[in-house]
Design a protein with these regions (language model features):
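Inter-helical turn/loop segments and adjacent helix faces that build the functional surface
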Residues: 145-157, 175
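N-terminal low-complexity or amphipathic/hydrophobic leaders
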Residues: 57-77
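Divalent metal-dependent phosphate-bond-processing catalytic cores, especially two-metal-ion Mg2+/Mn2+ enzymes
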Residues: 17-46, 64-69, 80-107, 119, ...
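Active-site alpha-helix of zinc metalloproteases
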Residues: 112-116
Length: 280
C-alpha cells in the first residue's frame, strides 16, 4: 500500500509540474474525461484475441529470446507516453496528420495514437523477425470489428484502421513514419527503457550490453522542451554512462526515422545531474 501511494504521489507531482514519468500509470491519467479513448481501451483490454497476442509476445520475446518486456505492461506504457507526446505537440500548435489530411478530427488522432501504441508489438506473438509486418497483418483482422463498435460510419472505421496499421508497421526503426501519429508512437516505444523493463531477461541470465545498459536507466520523463524549436524533451536519468547505449541505439534510432526528429531532444542526466543533451 505504501509503495502504491509513493508511486501515485510521484506521478501526481510530475503531472502538476509539467513532467510525466514514463510508467504504466500515464495511460489511465491521459484518458480521463475522454469517453472515446476510454471506450477503445476497455474494448482492447477485454478482447481475448488482443490480450492473447500480447501474452504470447512476451512468451516469444522474454522467455524464448531473453529480450525485455513486449507484453501488456509495455503496451500500456507506450500508449500513455504517446498520448503525452501528442498533447505536448498539440499544445505547441501542431496539426495532426489525420486532421490535416481530412481523415478525422483531433480526438480521432488521439484514438489512433493510443490504439497504434497499444498494439504496436503484437507481431512478436508470432516471431521477433518482421514483427512490425506480422503485427499489422494480425491487427488488420480485428481492428475493423473493434472500430465499428466505436464509429457508426463504416468508412471512417476503415480509414482509421489504415492509420492504426500504419502506426504498427512504422514503429520499426527501418521504416519511415509518414504521419505525425505514427512518428509519435515510434518515439513513445523508444522511451520505455527504464530498468524495470530489463529485469526479466536479466534475471534469466542475460548480461549483454542491451540488458546492462537498460539496467543503468533509472527513470525517463517526458516534458515540454526548453527551446521553441524542440517542443518535446525526453529526460533520461542514468546511474552510469552505460545508459547512453540505450539512448543512442534504441531511442535514437526510433527518433531518426520518426519524421518528428527535429522536434525532439533528449537530455541525459547522470544520477540527477546534467550529463549531455542529444539531438538526432
Amino acid at each position: 500500500m505504501l509503495l502504491f501511494f509513493r508511486t501515485y504521489l510521484i506521478i501526481s507531482l510530475s503531472l502538476n509540474l509539467g513532467m510525466v514519468l514514463v510508467s504504466p500509470a500515464i495511460l489511465k491519467k491521459k484518458i480521463e474525461g475522454r469517453p472515446l479513448l476510454d471506450q477503445a481501451l476497455k474494448i482492447l483490454e477485454k478482447n481475448a484475441e488482443v490480450q492473447s497476442y500480447l501474452t504470447m509476445a512476451n512468451v516469444m520475446a522474454v522467455q524464448r529470446l531473453l529480450y525485455n518486456d513486449h507484453g501488456p505492461v509495455h503496451s500500456r506504457i507506450v500508449a500513455g507516453a504517446a498520448l503525452q507526446i501528442l498533447d505536448i505537440m498539440l499544445d505547441d500548435g501542431f496539426i495532426p496528420s489525420i486532421v490535416r489530411d481530412g481523415v478525422g478530427d483531433e480526438e480521432d488522432s488521439r484514438l489512433v495514437v493510443m490504439m497504434g501504441a497499444y498494439l504496436h508489438d503484437i507481431g512478436n506473438a508470432v516471431h521477433r523477425s518482421y514483427h512490425h509486418v506480422t503485427g499489422a497483418a494480425l491487427a488488420a483482422r480485428f481492428l475493423p470489428k473493434i472500430l465499428r463498435k466505436i464509429y457508426q460510419d463504416p468508412q471512417k472505421a476503415y480509414r482509421l484502421t489504415a492509420e492504426i496499421l500504419h502506426c504498427i508497421l512504422s514503429h520499426d526503426e527501418e521504416v519511415m513514419a509518414l504521419s505525425l501519429e505514427a512518428g509519435i508512437v515510434k518515439v513513445a516505444d523508444g522511451v520505455d527503457m527504464a530498468e524495470g523493463r530489463a529485469r526479466m531477461p536479466y534475471k534469466q541470465g542475460k548480461y549483454d550490453i542491451h540488458a546492462l545498459s537498460a539496467l543503468a536507466i533509472r527513470r525517463v520523463e517526458i516534458v515540454e522542451g526548453r527551446s521553441g524549436d524542440r517542443p518535446v524533451r525526453i529526460v533520461v536519468d542514468m546511474d552510469n554512462e552505460a545508459g547512453i547505449f540505450q539512448i543512442e541505439e534504441v531511442l535514437g534510432k526510433k527518433i531518426k526515422s520518426s519524421s518528428i526528429a527535429r522536434y525532439v531532444e533528449v537530455e541525459a542526466l547522470r544520477r540527477g545531474e546534467p550529463f549531455r543533451v542529444i539531438r538526432f
